[in-house]
């Protein structure tokens, strides 16, 4: 069974025991989180589609760790002006392990 969940402005296709990196969640490592914004749940012809979410469907996950992504450099240069600016950014991520998918 699989599900499509929405978190952090993105959609992820998940299955039981899947490990996935998502946008940062405010939860401690080892804590359990629940995703209630489930868009699709099921398998094959038995899949249920939400409008926009499937009622009563919950995806449970365990927080494995928090980390940061690769550094992205934002560089701006104005030609012939002796002007340049460089700025780096590292996005915060949370690694979760899907433990259970509960259909309505």
Swiss-Prot record:
<dbReference type="InterPro" id="IPR001787">
    <property type="entry name" value="Ribosomal_bL21"/>
</dbReference>
<dbReference type="GO" id="GO:0003735">
    <property type="term" value="F:structural constituent of ribosome"/>
</dbReference>
<comment type="similarity">
    <text>Belongs to the bacterial ribosomal protein bL21 family.</text>
</comment>
<dbReference type="GO" id="GO:0005737">
    <property type="term" value="C:cytoplasm"/>
</dbReference>
<comment type="function">
    <text>This protein binds to 23S rRNA in the presence of protein L20.</text>
</comment>
<dbReference type="GO" id="GO:0019843">
    <property type="term" value="F:rRNA binding"/>
</dbReference>
<keyword id="KW-0694">RNA-binding</keyword>
<protein>
    <recommendedName>
        <fullName>Large ribosomal subunit protein bL21</fullName>
    </recommendedName>
</protein>
<dbReference type="InterPro" id="IPR036164">
    <property type="entry name" value="bL21-like_sf"/>
</dbReference>
<dbReference type="GO" id="GO:0006412">
    <property type="term" value="P:translation"/>
</dbReference>
<dbReference type="GO" id="GO:1990904">
    <property type="term" value="C:ribonucleoprotein complex"/>
</dbReference>
<comment type="subunit">
    <text>Part of the 50S ribosomal subunit. Contacts protein L20.</text>
</comment>
<keyword id="KW-0699">rRNA-binding</keyword>
<dbReference type="Pfam" id="PF00829">
    <property type="entry name" value="Ribosomal_L21p"/>
</dbReference>
<dbReference type="GO" id="GO:0005840">
    <property type="term" value="C:ribosome"/>
</dbReference>
<keyword id="KW-0689">Ribosomal protein</keyword>
<keyword id="KW-0687">Ribonucleoprotein</keyword>
<dbReference type="InterPro" id="IPR028909">
    <property type="entry name" value="bL21-like"/>
</dbReference>
């Amino acid at each position: 069974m699989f599900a499509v969940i929405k978190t952090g402005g993105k959609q992820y296709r998940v299955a039981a025991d899947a490990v996935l990196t998502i946008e940062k969640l405010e939860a401690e490592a080892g804590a359990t989180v629940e995703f209630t914004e489930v868009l699709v749940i099921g398998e094959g012809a038995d899949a249920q589609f939400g409008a926009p979410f499937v009622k009563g469907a919950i995806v449970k996950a365990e927080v494995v760790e928090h980390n940061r992504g690769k550094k992205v450099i934002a560089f701006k240069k104005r030609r012939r002006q002796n002007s340049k600016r460089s700025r780096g950014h590292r996005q915060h991520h949370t690694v979760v392990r899907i433990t259970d998918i509960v259909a309505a």
